[in-house]
Amino acid sequence: MKTSFNVIVGLTLLLVLGLLPSCGGKSNSDVNKKPYEEVAKFLVADESLSPVINEELDAYRMRRKDLKIDTLYTNEYDAVDMLVKRETWIAFTTRQLTPNEKQILSDRGLKPNVMPLAYDGMALIVNKNNPDSIIAANDFARIISGEISCWNEIDPSFPADTIRVAFDNPKSATYRFCSDSILRNKEMKTTGNIRAVQTSREVIDYVENHPDAIGIIGSLWLNDQRDTTNAVYGRDIRVLKVSKGDVATPTNSYDPSQYNIAYDNYPFIRTIYAIVTDPRSQGEARGLGNFCILPDGQLVFFHAGLFPARAEYSVRDVIIH
């Protein structure tokens, strides 16, 4: 018996020189309201990114054992707000800055460096007792918009149970992705059968304990087999395959793997960014951001199951006898 499948077998990470600008010159009076060192104490990030940001920090500390930067995991809205208000020099997000945010930073004498780091899939998870294994992207959009609320509205053979939808919180990167990308700039429903449970870990717990639930989390939470408190690995949870077609079938539905993200087979893909405003070219925040786009930093994303933004790769057919 032969089984043929595609795997990513090569990964050459590119170091692109000349893309790490430093910020010089004097800051205006608004920038100097807080001491530099006070602002440099910690990084901020959307909570859904915490597993891979922790890994990046661990890897960076191998180089910089004297690193004095702590983490504050919050929601994406507050993370960007803190960056703009000059309460941190670095934020990890899944969106770029708006023109208004760029202007505010410019008025404060700061030049943001927005660096794409990796690509992540927004994974849909269900309880293992749920009969569903595939879903069309447009059906999930109908669920989170409130158009449908029962499983048998997706497939008449499914039970008539209410679909319980779990996400982290209304200020998160997940919520924004659902509203902006899946619902095309329409508000996601947040009442009734759709509920915020605050964190990605709580989404996983909720789905594991509710057979009729569906949750949405970053795919980076699926892959860490070393920390079962963070991951879906070993839990009573199934990851749905999602189709771009109007009707999901086993042949047109894909999971959020590196391969399917790289080849754009999976419909729900987002970009992870580091946004750095550190005015010092040798500052810790700028050093951390730069590390994330260097080969060692990109390998951290690769090993976390994400697809690195700066990578060359090859795909071959592997035959197993």
Each PLM stretch: what is its role?
Residues 1-10:
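Bacterial N-terminal signal peptides that target proteins for export
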Residues 11-15:
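Core hydrophobic alpha-helical transmembrane segments of single-pass membrane proteins
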Residues 18-22:
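C-terminal motif of bacterial Sec signal peptides marking the signal peptidase cleavage site
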Residues 23-77, 81-84, 118, 126-321:
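Exported/periplasmic ABC-transporter solute-binding proteins
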Residues 76-108, 223-227:
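Pocket-flanking alpha-helical
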Residues 112-113:
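Periplasmic N-terminal soluble interaction domains immediately after the signal peptide in Gram-negative
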